[in-house]
Protein backbone atom coordinates (compact mmCIF):
# COMPACT_ATOMS: atom_id res chain seq x y z
CA UNK A 1 0.00 0.00 0.00
CA UNK A 2 1.10 3.56 -0.66
CA UNK A 3 2.39 5.53 2.29
CA UNK A 4 0.06 8.42 1.40
CA UNK A 5 -3.54 8.45 0.10
CA UNK A 6 -3.43 8.15 -3.65
CA UNK A 7 -4.09 11.32 -5.61
CA UNK A 8 -2.50 14.26 -7.38
CA UNK A 9 -3.58 17.64 -6.05
CA UNK A 10 -1.36 20.03 -7.99
CA UNK A 11 1.35 20.25 -10.64
CA UNK A 12 4.13 21.39 -8.29
CA UNK A 13 3.37 20.21 -4.76
CA UNK A 14 5.80 17.78 -3.14
CA UNK A 15 5.97 14.66 -5.30
CA UNK A 16 5.77 11.43 -3.30
CA UNK A 17 5.11 8.66 -5.82
CA UNK A 18 5.38 8.22 -9.59
CA UNK A 19 5.18 5.45 -12.13
CA UNK A 20 7.81 5.29 -14.87
CA UNK A 21 8.59 2.80 -17.63
CA UNK A 22 12.25 2.27 -18.43
CA UNK A 23 13.45 1.83 -22.02
CA UNK A 24 13.89 -1.83 -22.87
CA UNK A 25 12.87 -4.53 -25.31
CA UNK A 26 10.27 -2.36 -27.05
CA UNK A 27 13.01 0.10 -27.99
CA UNK A 28 15.25 -2.70 -29.18
CA UNK A 29 12.45 -3.56 -31.62
CA UNK A 30 12.56 -0.07 -33.18
CA UNK A 31 14.05 -0.03 -36.68
CA UNK A 32 14.39 2.66 -39.36
CA UNK A 33 11.43 1.08 -41.15
CA UNK A 34 9.02 0.97 -38.19
CA UNK A 35 10.03 3.82 -35.89
CA UNK A 36 7.77 6.43 -37.54
CA UNK A 37 4.74 4.13 -37.27
CA UNK A 38 5.64 3.64 -33.60
CA UNK A 39 5.84 7.44 -33.13
CA UNK A 40 9.62 7.73 -32.70
CA UNK A 41 11.66 10.10 -34.85
CA UNK A 42 14.61 7.73 -34.97
CA UNK A 43 15.95 4.52 -33.50
CA UNK A 44 17.55 4.74 -30.07
CA UNK A 45 20.93 3.82 -28.71
CA UNK A 46 19.08 1.73 -26.16
CA UNK A 47 21.91 1.21 -23.66
CA UNK A 48 22.43 4.97 -23.46
CA UNK A 49 18.70 5.56 -23.05
CA UNK A 50 18.62 3.01 -20.22
CA UNK A 51 21.57 4.70 -18.53
CA UNK A 52 20.02 8.16 -18.67
CA UNK A 53 16.63 6.87 -17.55
CA UNK A 54 18.30 5.17 -14.56
CA UNK A 55 19.97 8.50 -13.73
CA UNK A 56 16.56 10.17 -13.93
CA UNK A 57 15.07 7.64 -11.51
CA UNK A 58 18.05 8.06 -9.16
CA UNK A 59 17.54 11.83 -9.10
CA UNK A 60 13.87 11.41 -8.24
CA UNK A 61 14.70 8.98 -5.45
CA UNK A 62 17.33 11.35 -4.08
CA UNK A 63 14.42 13.70 -3.34
CA UNK A 64 12.54 10.90 -1.54
CA UNK A 65 10.18 10.18 -4.42
CA UNK A 66 8.96 6.58 -4.50
CA UNK A 67 9.46 5.40 -8.08
CA UNK A 68 7.37 2.48 -9.33
CA UNK A 69 8.56 0.78 -12.53
CA UNK A 70 5.84 -0.35 -14.92
CA UNK A 71 7.52 -3.60 -15.99
CA UNK A 72 7.72 -4.69 -12.34
CA UNK A 73 4.16 -3.59 -11.56
CA UNK A 74 2.94 -5.52 -14.58
CA UNK A 75 4.88 -8.63 -13.56
CA UNK A 76 3.33 -8.49 -10.08
CA UNK A 77 -0.12 -7.89 -11.59
CA UNK A 78 0.22 -10.99 -13.77
CA UNK A 79 0.79 -13.01 -10.60
CA UNK A 80 -2.47 -11.86 -8.98
CA UNK A 81 -5.78 -13.72 -9.15
CA UNK A 82 -7.56 -12.31 -12.16
CA UNK A 83 -4.81 -10.02 -13.37
CA UNK A 84 -3.31 -12.38 -15.93
CA UNK A 85 -6.71 -13.45 -17.26
CA UNK A 86 -7.85 -9.84 -17.55
CA UNK A 87 -4.88 -8.94 -19.74
CA UNK A 88 -4.72 -12.08 -21.86
CA UNK A 89 -8.48 -12.19 -22.43
CA UNK A 90 -8.13 -8.89 -24.27
CA UNK A 91 -4.67 -9.13 -25.78
CA UNK A 92 -5.45 -12.47 -27.42
CA UNK A 93 -8.79 -11.56 -28.97
CA UNK A 94 -9.03 -12.42 -32.66
CA UNK A 95 -9.18 -8.72 -33.51
CA UNK A 96 -5.79 -8.22 -31.85
CA UNK A 97 -3.79 -11.31 -32.88
CA UNK A 98 -5.83 -12.77 -35.73
CA UNK A 99 -8.17 -15.73 -35.78
CA UNK A 100 -7.18 -19.13 -34.54
CA UNK A 101 -3.95 -18.49 -32.61
CA UNK A 102 -5.02 -16.91 -29.31
CA UNK A 103 -5.59 -20.18 -27.48
CA UNK A 104 -2.20 -21.65 -28.34
CA UNK A 105 -0.42 -18.40 -27.54
CA UNK A 106 -2.17 -18.30 -24.19
CA UNK A 107 -1.01 -21.80 -23.32
CA UNK A 108 2.56 -20.86 -24.29
CA UNK A 109 2.41 -17.62 -22.30
CA UNK A 110 1.17 -19.44 -19.22
CA UNK A 111 4.21 -21.74 -19.33
CA UNK A 112 6.81 -18.95 -19.45
CA UNK A 113 8.21 -17.03 -16.45
CA UNK A 114 6.01 -14.12 -15.45
CA UNK A 115 8.83 -11.59 -15.83
CA UNK A 116 9.31 -12.69 -19.45
CA UNK A 117 5.59 -12.38 -20.17
CA UNK A 118 5.55 -8.87 -18.72
CA UNK A 119 8.54 -7.99 -20.88
CA UNK A 120 6.80 -9.27 -24.03
CA UNK A 121 3.54 -7.48 -23.27
CA UNK A 122 5.43 -4.18 -23.37
CA UNK A 123 8.31 -5.17 -25.64
CA UNK A 124 6.27 -6.89 -28.33
CA UNK A 125 6.35 -10.37 -29.82
CA UNK A 126 7.41 -11.01 -33.43
CA UNK A 127 5.99 -14.06 -35.19
CA UNK A 128 9.60 -15.07 -35.72
CA UNK A 129 10.07 -15.69 -31.97
CA UNK A 130 7.04 -17.95 -31.52
CA UNK A 131 7.85 -21.68 -31.43
CA UNK A 132 7.34 -23.43 -34.74
CA UNK A 133 4.15 -25.40 -35.06
CA UNK A 134 1.93 -23.14 -32.94
CA UNK A 135 -1.12 -21.61 -34.55
CA UNK A 136 -2.18 -24.36 -36.98
CA UNK A 137 0.21 -23.12 -39.66
CA UNK A 138 -0.83 -19.47 -39.44
CA UNK A 139 2.19 -18.36 -37.43
CA UNK A 140 4.56 -20.38 -39.60
CA UNK A 141 3.10 -18.70 -42.69
CA UNK A 142 3.47 -15.21 -41.21
CA UNK A 143 7.03 -15.99 -40.19
CA UNK A 144 7.86 -17.26 -43.66
CA UNK A 145 6.28 -14.33 -45.51
CA UNK A 146 7.27 -11.40 -43.30
CA UNK A 147 10.29 -12.60 -41.34
CA UNK A 148 11.13 -10.48 -38.30
CA UNK A 149 9.07 -7.47 -39.40
CA UNK A 150 5.61 -8.78 -38.45
CA UNK A 151 4.42 -8.74 -34.84
CA UNK A 152 1.87 -10.96 -33.15
CA UNK A 153 1.97 -8.40 -30.32
CA UNK A 154 3.14 -4.93 -31.29
CA UNK A 155 5.86 -3.33 -29.17
CA UNK A 156 4.80 -0.43 -26.98
CA UNK A 157 7.89 1.83 -26.81
CA UNK A 158 5.81 4.88 -25.92
CA UNK A 159 5.14 3.42 -22.48
CA UNK A 160 8.42 5.24 -21.74
CA UNK A 161 6.19 8.31 -21.64
CA UNK A 162 4.18 7.03 -18.69
CA UNK A 163 2.29 10.30 -18.27
CA UNK A 164 -0.12 9.63 -21.10
CA UNK A 165 -2.09 6.40 -20.77
CA UNK A 166 -3.46 7.29 -17.35
CA UNK A 167 -3.76 10.53 -15.40
CA UNK A 168 -4.32 10.96 -11.68
CA UNK A 169 -6.67 13.89 -11.08
CA UNK A 170 -7.18 14.82 -7.43
CA UNK A 171 -8.55 11.70 -5.70
CA UNK A 172 -8.94 9.47 -8.72
CA UNK A 173 -7.58 8.38 -12.07
CA UNK A 174 -8.57 8.57 -15.71
CA UNK A 175 -7.70 5.57 -17.89
CA UNK A 176 -7.10 7.28 -21.18
CA UNK A 177 -8.14 6.13 -24.67
CA UNK A 178 -5.07 6.98 -26.74
CA UNK A 179 -5.32 8.81 -30.04
CA UNK A 180 -2.71 6.96 -32.12
CA UNK A 181 -2.99 3.24 -33.02
CA UNK A 182 0.61 2.64 -31.87
CA UNK A 183 -0.51 3.47 -28.31
CA UNK A 184 -4.00 1.98 -28.16
CA UNK A 185 -3.03 -1.07 -26.10
CA UNK A 186 -0.99 0.73 -23.45
CA UNK A 187 -4.03 1.61 -21.35
CA UNK A 188 -5.04 -2.04 -20.98
CA UNK A 189 -1.86 -2.64 -18.99
CA UNK A 190 -2.31 0.31 -16.64
CA UNK A 191 -5.97 -0.58 -16.22
CA UNK A 192 -4.93 -4.07 -15.13
CA UNK A 193 -2.33 -2.65 -12.72
CA UNK A 194 -4.80 -0.25 -11.06
CA UNK A 195 -7.50 -2.92 -10.76
CA UNK A 196 -5.47 -5.98 -9.75
CA UNK A 197 -2.10 -5.03 -8.29
CA UNK A 198 -2.31 -5.26 -4.46
CA UNK A 199 -0.89 -1.75 -4.12
CA UNK A 200 -3.93 -0.35 -5.92
CA UNK A 201 -6.67 -2.98 -5.71
CA UNK A 202 -7.23 -2.29 -2.01
CA UNK A 203 -6.56 1.46 -2.14
CA UNK A 204 -9.16 4.20 -1.79
CA UNK A 205 -9.51 6.04 -5.09
CA UNK A 206 -11.99 6.45 -7.92
CA UNK A 207 -11.89 5.79 -11.63
CA UNK A 208 -13.06 8.98 -13.27
CA UNK A 209 -13.02 7.62 -16.80
CA UNK A 210 -12.10 4.61 -18.89
CA UNK A 211 -12.50 1.68 -16.48
CA UNK A 212 -14.97 0.03 -18.81
CA UNK A 213 -15.00 -2.28 -21.83
CA UNK A 214 -16.97 0.30 -23.82
CA UNK A 215 -15.26 1.25 -27.09
CA UNK A 216 -14.15 4.92 -26.96
CA UNK A 217 -15.34 5.85 -30.45
CA UNK A 218 -13.87 9.26 -31.31
CA UNK A 219 -12.94 10.01 -27.70
CA UNK A 220 -9.21 10.42 -27.12
CA UNK A 221 -7.47 11.63 -23.96
CA UNK A 222 -3.77 11.69 -23.16
CA UNK A 223 -2.17 12.53 -19.83
CA UNK A 224 0.27 15.05 -21.29
CA UNK A 225 -2.79 17.22 -21.89
CA UNK A 226 -4.20 16.84 -18.36
CA UNK A 227 -3.07 18.98 -15.42
CA UNK A 228 -4.84 19.12 -12.02
CA UNK A 229 -3.44 22.44 -10.82
CA UNK A 230 -5.31 22.97 -7.54
CA UNK A 231 -8.55 24.46 -6.19
CA UNK A 232 -10.42 21.78 -8.12
CA UNK A 233 -9.27 23.22 -11.46
CA UNK A 234 -8.18 20.90 -14.26
CA UNK A 235 -6.38 22.08 -17.39
CA UNK A 236 -6.89 19.94 -20.48
CA UNK A 237 -5.11 20.51 -23.77
CA UNK A 238 -7.14 19.81 -26.89
CA UNK A 239 -4.90 19.49 -29.92
CA UNK A 240 -3.23 16.65 -31.80
CA UNK A 241 -3.84 13.89 -29.25
CA UNK A 242 -6.91 14.83 -27.18
CA UNK A 243 -10.36 15.29 -28.72
CA UNK A 244 -13.47 17.16 -27.66
CA UNK A 245 -15.25 13.83 -27.30
CA UNK A 246 -12.69 12.82 -24.68
CA UNK A 247 -12.47 16.17 -22.88
CA UNK A 248 -16.22 16.59 -22.62
CA UNK A 249 -16.81 13.13 -21.17
CA UNK A 250 -14.00 13.52 -18.64
CA UNK A 251 -15.34 16.92 -17.57
CA UNK A 252 -18.86 15.54 -17.22
CA UNK A 253 -17.66 12.69 -15.00
CA UNK A 254 -15.53 14.99 -12.83
CA UNK A 255 -18.47 17.35 -12.32
CA UNK A 256 -20.87 14.48 -11.59
CA UNK A 257 -18.51 13.26 -8.86
CA UNK A 258 -17.88 16.73 -7.45
CA UNK A 259 -14.18 16.23 -8.20
CA UNK A 260 -13.60 19.44 -10.17
CA UNK A 261 -14.75 23.04 -9.86
CA UNK A 262 -13.91 23.89 -13.47
CA UNK A 263 -12.16 22.44 -16.48
CA UNK A 264 -10.14 24.91 -18.54
CA UNK A 265 -9.59 23.63 -22.06
CA UNK A 266 -6.54 24.76 -24.02
CA UNK A 267 -7.63 24.59 -27.66
CA UNK A 268 -4.41 24.17 -29.65
CA UNK A 269 -3.26 23.61 -33.22
CA UNK A 270 -2.87 19.94 -34.16
CA UNK A 271 0.89 19.72 -34.59
CA UNK A 272 3.41 17.05 -33.59
CA UNK A 273 5.84 19.57 -32.09
CA UNK A 274 3.11 20.58 -29.65
CA UNK A 275 1.23 17.29 -29.46
CA UNK A 276 0.30 17.83 -25.79
CA UNK A 277 -0.17 20.87 -23.59
CA UNK A 278 2.87 19.83 -21.55
CA UNK A 279 5.14 20.10 -24.60
CA UNK A 280 4.69 23.89 -24.53
CA UNK A 281 3.75 24.64 -20.90
CA UNK A 282 4.64 23.19 -17.50
CA UNK A 283 4.54 24.53 -13.95
CA UNK A 284 7.69 25.44 -12.02
CA UNK A 285 6.09 26.79 -8.85
CA UNK A 286 2.64 27.82 -7.71
CA UNK A 287 2.81 31.07 -9.68
CA UNK A 288 5.61 30.32 -12.13
CA UNK A 289 5.50 28.48 -15.47
CA UNK A 290 7.75 27.81 -18.42
CA UNK A 291 6.14 28.30 -21.81
CA UNK A 292 6.83 28.36 -25.53
CA UNK A 293 5.09 31.61 -26.46
CA UNK A 294 4.82 30.87 -30.18
CA UNK A 295 2.20 28.23 -29.29
CA UNK A 296 0.92 29.23 -25.86
CA UNK A 297 0.01 32.73 -27.03
CA UNK A 298 -2.29 31.21 -29.66
CA UNK A 299 -4.19 28.91 -27.28
CA UNK A 300 -7.93 29.60 -27.12
CA UNK A 301 -9.36 28.95 -23.65
CA UNK A 302 -12.74 27.32 -23.16
CA UNK A 303 -13.98 27.03 -19.58
CA UNK A 304 -16.41 24.33 -18.51
CA UNK A 305 -18.33 24.75 -15.24
CA UNK A 306 -20.62 22.40 -13.32
CA UNK A 307 -24.05 22.53 -14.90
CA UNK A 308 -26.76 24.94 -13.78
CA UNK A 309 -29.26 23.42 -16.23
CA UNK A 310 -30.04 20.08 -17.84
CA UNK A 311 -26.84 20.28 -19.90
CA UNK A 312 -23.83 18.24 -18.70
CA UNK A 313 -21.90 21.47 -18.00
CA UNK A 314 -21.95 25.20 -18.62
CA UNK A 315 -19.61 26.58 -21.29
CA UNK A 316 -17.75 29.89 -21.11
CA UNK A 317 -15.65 31.38 -23.92
CA UNK A 318 -13.38 33.99 -22.28
CA UNK A 319 -11.80 36.87 -24.18
CA UNK A 320 -8.63 36.86 -22.05
CA UNK A 321 -5.53 34.84 -22.90
CA UNK A 322 -5.21 31.26 -21.72
CA UNK A 323 -2.66 32.08 -18.99
CA UNK A 324 -4.74 35.05 -17.83
CA UNK A 325 -7.77 32.78 -17.50
CA UNK A 326 -5.79 30.19 -15.52
CA UNK A 327 -4.23 32.81 -13.22
CA UNK A 328 -7.64 34.34 -12.55
CA UNK A 329 -9.12 30.93 -11.73
CA UNK A 330 -6.33 30.30 -9.21
CA UNK A 331 -6.78 33.74 -7.68
CA UNK A 332 -3.30 35.02 -8.48
CA UNK A 333 -2.54 38.27 -10.26
CA UNK A 334 -0.45 36.81 -13.03
CA UNK A 335 2.04 34.04 -13.69
CA UNK A 336 5.74 34.68 -13.90
CA UNK A 337 6.41 33.17 -17.33
CA UNK A 338 9.88 31.91 -18.22
CA UNK A 339 9.91 31.55 -21.97
CA UNK A 340 11.93 29.07 -24.00
CA UNK A 341 15.51 30.34 -24.17
CA UNK A 342 17.76 31.48 -27.00
CA UNK A 343 17.09 33.27 -30.27
CA UNK A 344 14.29 32.24 -32.62
CA UNK A 345 16.22 29.25 -33.92
CA UNK A 346 17.50 28.07 -30.54
CA UNK A 347 14.06 28.43 -28.96
CA UNK A 348 12.45 26.33 -31.69
CA UNK A 349 15.12 23.65 -31.27
CA UNK A 350 14.87 23.62 -27.49
CA UNK A 351 11.07 23.41 -27.52
CA UNK A 352 11.37 20.46 -29.91
CA UNK A 353 13.84 18.94 -27.45
CA UNK A 354 11.38 19.30 -24.55
CA UNK A 355 12.77 22.43 -22.87
CA UNK A 356 9.28 23.30 -21.61
CA UNK A 357 8.49 19.71 -20.60
CA UNK A 358 9.95 19.75 -17.10
CA UNK A 359 8.60 17.90 -14.07
CA UNK A 360 8.45 19.51 -10.65
CA UNK A 361 9.73 17.46 -7.71
CA UNK A 362 8.56 20.13 -5.29
CA UNK A 363 7.83 23.85 -5.62
CA UNK A 364 10.72 25.52 -7.42
CA UNK A 365 12.66 22.30 -8.15
CA UNK A 366 12.38 20.67 -11.58
CA UNK A 367 14.05 17.96 -13.67
CA UNK A 368 15.07 19.04 -17.17
CA UNK A 369 17.07 17.72 -20.10
CA UNK A 370 20.70 18.85 -20.08
CA UNK A 371 20.70 19.77 -23.78
CA UNK A 372 18.40 22.77 -23.29
CA UNK A 373 21.09 25.13 -22.03
CA UNK A 374 19.40 28.42 -22.92
CA UNK A 375 16.10 27.58 -21.24
CA UNK A 376 17.72 25.98 -18.20
CA UNK A 377 19.83 29.11 -17.70
CA UNK A 378 16.68 31.25 -17.76
CA UNK A 379 14.99 28.97 -15.24
CA UNK A 380 17.95 29.25 -12.87
CA UNK A 381 18.05 33.02 -13.30
CA UNK A 382 14.40 33.05 -12.20
CA UNK A 383 15.27 31.19 -9.00
CA UNK A 384 14.30 27.68 -10.09
CA UNK A 385 16.52 24.77 -9.08
CA UNK A 386 17.15 22.73 -12.23
CA UNK A 387 18.23 19.09 -11.94
CA UNK A 388 19.66 18.11 -15.32
CA UNK A 389 19.56 14.61 -16.80
CA UNK A 390 21.04 13.15 -19.99
CA UNK A 391 18.83 13.58 -23.02
CA UNK A 392 20.52 12.42 -26.22
CA UNK A 393 18.32 9.31 -26.59
CA UNK A 394 15.36 9.71 -24.22
CA UNK A 395 13.67 12.45 -26.23
CA UNK A 396 13.48 10.67 -29.58
CA UNK A 397 9.79 9.97 -29.01
CA UNK A 398 9.24 13.66 -28.15
CA UNK A 399 8.98 13.74 -24.39
CA UNK A 400 10.92 15.03 -21.39
CA UNK A 401 10.72 14.58 -17.63
CA UNK A 402 7.06 15.58 -17.44
CA UNK A 403 6.14 13.01 -20.10
CA UNK A 404 8.22 10.25 -18.50
CA UNK A 405 6.46 10.41 -15.13
CA UNK A 406 2.93 9.49 -14.12
CA UNK A 407 2.50 11.12 -10.69
CA UNK A 408 0.34 9.04 -8.38
CA UNK A 409 0.81 10.89 -5.08
CA UNK A 410 1.47 14.64 -5.11
CA UNK A 411 0.63 17.23 -2.47
CA UNK A 412 -1.48 20.32 -2.96
CA UNK A 413 -0.07 23.84 -2.94
CA UNK A 414 -1.63 26.90 -1.34
CA UNK A 415 -3.30 29.53 -3.50
UniProtKB/Swiss-Prot annotation:
Location(s) in or outside the cell: Cytoplasm
Reactions mediated catalytically: L-arginine + H2O = L-citrulline + NH4(+)
EC category name: hydrolase
Sorted UniProt keywords: Arginine metabolism, Cytoplasm, Hydrolase
InterPro entries per the UniProt record, alphabetical: Arg_deiminase (IPR003876)
Keyword tRNA processing found: no
GO BP annotations listed: arginine catabolic process to ornithine; arginine deiminase pathway
Cysteine disulfide partners in this protein: none
Main localization of the protein described in the UniProt heading: cytoplasm
Molecular function per GO: arginine deiminase activity
Gene3D superfamilies cross-referenced by the UniProt entry: Arginine deiminase (1.10.3930.10), L-arginine/glycine Amidinotransferase, Chain A (3.75.10.10)
Its EC number(s): 3.5.3.6
Domain of life, per lineage: Bacteria
Active-site residues, Swiss-Prot/TrEMBL: 403
Keyword Cell cycle set for record: no
Pathway: Amino-acid degradation; L-arginine degradation via ADI pathway; carbamoyl phosphate from L-arginine: step 1/2
GO annotation, cellular component aspect: cytoplasm
SUPFAM superfamilies: Pentein
Family stated for the protein in its record: Belongs to the arginine deiminase family.
Name of the protein: Arginine deiminase
Organism: Corynebacterium aurimucosum (strain ATCC 700975 / DSM 44827 / CIP 107346 / CN-1) (Corynebacterium nigricans)
Lineage: Bacteria, Bacillati, Actinomycetota, Actinomycetes, Mycobacteriales
Gene name for this UniProt entry: arcA
Amino acid sequence: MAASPLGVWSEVGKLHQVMVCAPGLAHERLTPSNCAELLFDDVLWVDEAKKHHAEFVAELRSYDVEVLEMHKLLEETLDTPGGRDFILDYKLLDRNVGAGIGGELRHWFNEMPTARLAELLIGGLPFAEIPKGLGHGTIDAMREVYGPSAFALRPLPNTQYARDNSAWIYGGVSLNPMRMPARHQETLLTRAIYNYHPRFAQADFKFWYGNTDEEPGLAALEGGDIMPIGKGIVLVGMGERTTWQGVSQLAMRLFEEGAATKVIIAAMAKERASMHLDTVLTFLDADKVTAYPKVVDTIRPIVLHPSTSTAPFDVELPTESFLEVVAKALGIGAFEVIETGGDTYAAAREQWDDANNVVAIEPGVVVAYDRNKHTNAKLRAAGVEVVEIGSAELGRGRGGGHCMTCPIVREAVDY
